[in-house]
Every structure is written in C-alpha cells, then in structure tokens.
Amino acid sequence: MEYASDASLDPEAPWPPAPRARACRVLPWALVAGLLLLLLLAAACAVFLACPWAVSGARASPGSAASPRLREGPELSPDDPAGLLDLRQGMFAQLVAQNVLLIDGPLSWYSDPGLAGVSLTGGLSYKEDTKELVVAKAGVYYVFFQLELRRVVAGEGSGSVSLALHLQPLRSAAGAAALALTVDLPPASSEARNSAFGFQGRLLHLSAGQRLGVHLHTEARARHAWQLTQGATVLGLFRVTPEIPAGLPSPRSE
C-alpha cells in the first residue's frame, strides 16, 4: 500500500499506460455500425435501380394499353366485346342455333359444352322447354348475338331478318326487346352477295334468375331463299362485374 501511494505521489515516476479494454470494446461496435450503414446504402441503391425497371416492364406488357378499364355506367365500351373479355368474372355462355330454317318464333339452341362453339359455365343454364338461357347470379353482363345467313336459292330472296332478345320477367308491360338486330339481305340479282352477317351486343344489368330468349322474324320474301349458316348464329353473354355502375339499365327500370 505504501509503495503504490509513493509512486503515485512521485512526479518523476512514469505514468502507467492507459487501459485498453474500453478501446477494444468501442472498436468492434464502430465497425458493425459502419457495415450496417453500407448495407443500408446498398439496399437503397438496389431498390432505386429496380423501380424504373418494374414500371417499364408493366408498360411494355402486350395489350395492356388496349385493355378497357371498368368505369361508371355506360362508359364501359360495350362496342368492344374482345376487350370486355378481360373483365369477365368467370361466367360465360355461348349457345349455337339448332335450326337453320327461317321460322318465325323463339330460337332453339345447342347447349352441350362438348359441341363445337358451345360454352356454358357454372351459374348459367339452358332450359330446353322454354328455349331460354338462365342467369343464376345478378350482375352486369355483356349480352350479344351474332346472325349469319346464306342464300340457298340463287337469284331469289331479299328483305331482312331480325333477332330480338326478350327477358323474363319482362322489363316493362310492353315487353320491349332488351337487344335487337336486323340484317338486310342483298337483293336478288346475279351480282348480289350470297351471304349476310350481323352482330349486336350490349351491357345489361341482369337479376338472379333472369331468363333470356331470342325471337326470330323474317320477311316473307326472304324465307324460302335464305337459311341460317350452320353453327354461325350464336347467343352469348359473360358477367363483367357483380357491381351495378350508376346509370346502367336494369331489368326493371326500362
């Protein structure tokens, strides 16, 4: 005890070296902090470089610019059925007309999905007895039909052929058609075309249980000289959304 006390009081005695334990503890923490900072900077640079690449890739995807986007009400581009297919909600039907003869009245349809051109997914069904397509779930649907005809008697027959879509329950007391199409046939002459084609489609709000039937009407002068082209006259629909955009016609509002 006396030796330690004397050495500490002697001004000429050399000072003991500073303890290194604290410096050894500080140095590793400084290195770790520096490494973490470098890693954070590297990660930030990687994110910065990746963001422009992701945006550029999204813009470059084929067809993305042309695909329609669901807006309010009638702005849904009903004249672009191919684009609306991008929006369909898994419910799709396409039926093919059975009879080729131009007989006025409700059309009968092939509904077996195993047949060419026929599709019928869950939530949709066809009633043979009433010749109607039945919708099980409410929503906004794009409904369409296509009419194709061919001349079977050369140089004869003109006029027009019409299709009209009717809904049950009825839209109104008058029972106006929800969708209509008229195809004018070329005149009976040697230069006339021997085929005719028409397409019509529309967005409709359909209720659960809604039934859709198509009626054919032909002018008498065309009935014997023209027929439906086999497999080319179709009725179809697909659901775009279960929501009802403002301003869209409903089954009971017209």
From Swiss-Prot:
GO terms for cellular component: extracellular space; plasma membrane. CDD domains: TNF (cd00184). Residues 1-28 are cytoplasmic. GO terms for molecular function: cytokine activity; signaling receptor binding; tumor necrosis factor receptor binding; tumor necrosis factor receptor superfamily binding. It is found in: Membrane. It is a single-pass type II membrane protein. Gene3D superfamilies: 2.60.120.40. GO terms for biological process: cell-cell signaling; immune response; positive regulation of activated T cell proliferation; positive regulation of cytotoxic T cell differentiation; regulation of apoptotic process; regulation of T cell proliferation. Its main location: membrane. The chain crosses the membrane at residues 29-49. Keywords: Cytokine, Membrane, Signal-anchor, Transmembrane, Transmembrane helix. Expressed in brain, placenta, lung, skeletal muscle and kidney. Residues 50-254 are extracellular. Residues 91-240 form the THD domain. Cytokine that binds to TNFRSF9. Induces the proliferation of activated peripheral blood T-cells. May have a role in activation-induced cell death (AICD). May play a role in cognate interactions between T-cells and B-cells/macrophages. Belongs to the tumor necrosis factor family. Homotrimer. This is Tumor necrosis factor ligand superfamily member 9. It comes from Homo sapiens.
